[in-house]
Every structure is written in structure tokens, then in C-alpha cells.
Amino acid sequence: MIKKMKFDIFYVDAFSKEVFSGNPAAVIFKHFEDEKMQSIASENNLSETAFIDLENNYIRWFSPKCEVDLCGHATLAAAHVFFEYIDNNSSLITFNSNSGELKAYKKDSIIYLDFPKDNFKQVDE
């Protein structure tokens, strides 16, 4: 017996206005168990698939092989989908993530990302 699943997947070409150019990412506004998210990302076979749980705006990114801590182009893609299809009256979304709060602003059809500052450490040579 085949088990069916139904959900929307948005394919976005980040950093481009042209289809089939830029940096592709898949975006899914639905929460799944970790194993299911990994399977979906593997099936998509893109560098990253972003999963966003709209109950708490929690975003996670999966490559075909594993979960990753942060992905800029997939976050940009998720913000684009949010502003265009989820809440087109909004100009700000704050994603919660394992890397902290990630803010996306939309102004004049341009999306800006504000990521947390990384704390660099000096390493010995």
C-alpha cells in the first residue's frame, strides 16, 4: 500500500529574476519529523531544502545528506515565498533557528537579510 502525503513545495532561484538561474532552493512551510525532512530533502536533491514551522517561524535546512546549521540562499528563498504567498501584507519576518534569530525585511520588492554576528576567535598558527 502506498502512503500519500500532500504538501506544497516552492522551488525558488535565489539571487536571480530568471528561471533556471541563480541558486536554487526548495521551501516547505510545514513541520515534519527529522527523518521525513531528510527524506524530502534527499528526494529534492538540491543543495538545501528549507522547512518552516509557521507556528513559531522556526526554520531548518537540510541538504540531501544532512541537516545544516545555516543557509543564506534558502533563507532568502523562504522569505520570498513568505512575502509573496503566505503574508503579502507583511514586510518583516523573523525566523527562529539553531543559529539564532534571522530577520528578513522587504522594501521596494527587495528582500534584505539580517543574520546574527559571528564571534570570531583567533587561532594559533
Please identify what each model-predicted range represents:
Residues 25-28, 50-52, 102-105:
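Short beta-strand scaffold segments in enzyme catalytic cores
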